[in-house]
């Protein structure tokens, strides 16, 4: 039998429908792969008993002739999604051994469509990070290595466990969240596909909040088609989430293979930043050539407020985080460190429970929201955000169908290489991705090449609001031209 963990999600769906193998066999193959890849530290919790029970239920449904979008498909879930009676920590000590009594809307939709839960995936603490080095459960190791080197590399963040697990064949797909690039950047670093849908496309109910006006959940998968299949189950209106948009969910998979002839693709001149590697520049030009060869028109565009996006993001996101994280006080759930007074108990609990990066962002957020600085920082950042959104609206109003940019300024870097002395160095990883969150747009990262050391590099496509289908069509065009990328197994 073929190695079941090497299948794409679409192939696995076909195999299950044809009864070439069972959902239990597919699940067991992934559980075995997870066991042999623990050195990657992708999972913070494995749920083999639950997975096998769900797989058996899927086999029963398949035997009855039932068809469903994800029936029998084993998935990993980022440890930011509430999963009923299954531990949720946000990879922070402050949530300790918390088991939510409810299910997030997105995971309940995945289980409705027949998916199987393999376990919870590692991420940066409270999704704050670009390298998965802030998790209370330790670093995730990227399954990719530089040629001729055994240096451990970061998988990107915050959804590093999700990206590493999909790239290493430890699940057929995974959930992630993206606040400033936390799906697209890890996907780029691990040679897989990651899409951040339009803000409001997927429910945020039951997902631990970082920055509520920026957070959006989305899928990780090995191919563009697999991403489209997963997004169909994840998307949809949810009355429990006031930011969820009531729009029909299209059949995203139908966009795969559609012609891109006549589409107008924008190349923003402001994304040509100083210090960009020649490899990224060449890849960007190559991506434009591939789309041109497929019949698309390449147009140079301007997004003049791009240079303000990163500083504005690092005012807005910490401000919202400081408000959202005020609820973690050790009173009703999670870890508690006692004190002589209730105020001291709050202080002790939060000091011991939050890691240094989370504490840093809470302090920045509290500072920019304080009476003396609210207008100077937070209000000004929100005005900049409006200008960034307007830049995109004006470009799309001129008939641009999508925008092509690099996904990251570099390939994956070594653990401990960045941000130790200066956190801003780490924040610069989000330079190509934050604008998409600030404007609430959809963005997809698609692997498109390798650097001189054999590490994957990706391109990003940015679309009009709720036009993920165009991104899937264009993304698949790049995927067909570039081919697929898989790490050599060393673990």
Swiss-Prot record:
The keyword Protein biosynthesis applies. GO terms for biological process: translation. It comes from the Bacteria. Keywords: ATP-binding, Ligase, Nucleotide-binding, Protein biosynthesis. PROSITE patterns: AMIDASES. GO terms for molecular function: ATP binding; glutaminyl-tRNA synthase (glutamine-hydrolyzing) activity. One of its GO terms (cellular component) is glutamyl-tRNA(Gln) amidotransferase complex. The keyword Transcription regulation does not apply. Heterotrimer of A, B and C subunits. This is Glutamyl-tRNA(Gln) amidotransferase subunit A. It comes from Afipia carboxidovorans (strain ATCC 49405 / DSM 1227 / KCTC 32145 / OM5).
């Amino acid at each position: 039998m073929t190695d079941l963990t090497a299948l794409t999600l679409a192939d696995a769906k076909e195999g299950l429908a044809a009864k070439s193998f069972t959902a239990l066999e597919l699940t067991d193959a992934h559980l075995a792969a997870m066991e042999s890849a623990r050195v990657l530290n992708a999972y913070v919790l494995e749920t083999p008993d639950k997975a096998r029970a769900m797989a058996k239920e899927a086999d029963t449904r398949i035997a009855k002739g039932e068809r469903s979008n994800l029936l029998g498909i084993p998935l990993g879930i980022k440890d930011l999604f509430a999963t009923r009676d299954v531990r949720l920590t946000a990879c922070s000590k402050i949530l300790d051994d918390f088991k939510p009594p409810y299910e997030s809307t997105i995971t309940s939709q995945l289980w409705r469509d027949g998916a199987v839960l393999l376990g919870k995936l590692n991420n940066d603490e409270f999704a704050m990070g670009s390298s998965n080095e802030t998790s209370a459960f330790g670093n995730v190791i990227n399954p990719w290595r530089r040629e001729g080197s055994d240096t451990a590399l970061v998988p990107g963040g915050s959804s590093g466990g999700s990206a590493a697990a999909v790239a290493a064949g430890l699940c057929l797909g995974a959930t992630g969240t993206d606040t400033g690039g936390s799906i697209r950047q890890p996907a780029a670093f691990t040679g897989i596909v990651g899409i951040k849908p339009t803000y409001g496309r997927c429910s945020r109910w039951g997902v631990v909040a970082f920055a509520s006006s920026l957070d959006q959940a989305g899928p990780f998968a090995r191919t563009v088609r697999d991403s489209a299949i997963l997004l169909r189950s994840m998307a949809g209106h949810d009355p429990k989430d006031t930011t969820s948009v009531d729009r029909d969910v299209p059949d995203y998979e139908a966009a795969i293979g559609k012609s891109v002839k006549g589409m107008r693709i924008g190349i923003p001149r402001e994304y040509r930043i100083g210090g960009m590697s020649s490899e990224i520049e060449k890849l960007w030009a190559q991506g434009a050539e591939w789309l041109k060869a497929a019949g698309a028109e390449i147009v140079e565009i301007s997004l003049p407020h791009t240079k303000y996006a990163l500083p504005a993001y690092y005012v807005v996101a910490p401000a919202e985080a400081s408000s959202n994280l005020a609820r973690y006080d050790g009173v009703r759930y999670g870890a508690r460190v006692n004190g002589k007074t209730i105020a001291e108990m709050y202080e002790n609990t939060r000091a011991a429970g939050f890691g240094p990066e989370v504490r840093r962002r809470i302090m920045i957020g509290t500072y920019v929201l304080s009476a003396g600085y609210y207008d100077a920082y937070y209000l000004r950042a929100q005005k900049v955000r409006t200008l960034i959104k307007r830049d995109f609206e004006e470009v799309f109003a001129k008939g641009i169908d999508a925008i092509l940019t690099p996904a990251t300024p570099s390939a994956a870097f070594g653990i401990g290489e960045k941000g130790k002395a200066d956190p801003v160095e780490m924040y610069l990883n989000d330079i190509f991705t934050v604008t998409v969150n600030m404007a609430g747009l959809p963005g997809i990262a698609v692997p498109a090449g390798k650097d001189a050391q054999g590490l994957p590099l990706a391109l990003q496509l940015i679309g009009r609001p709720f036009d993920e289908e165009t991104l899937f069509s264009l993304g698949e065009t790049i995927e067909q031209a570039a081919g697929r990328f898989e790490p050599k197994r060393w673990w």
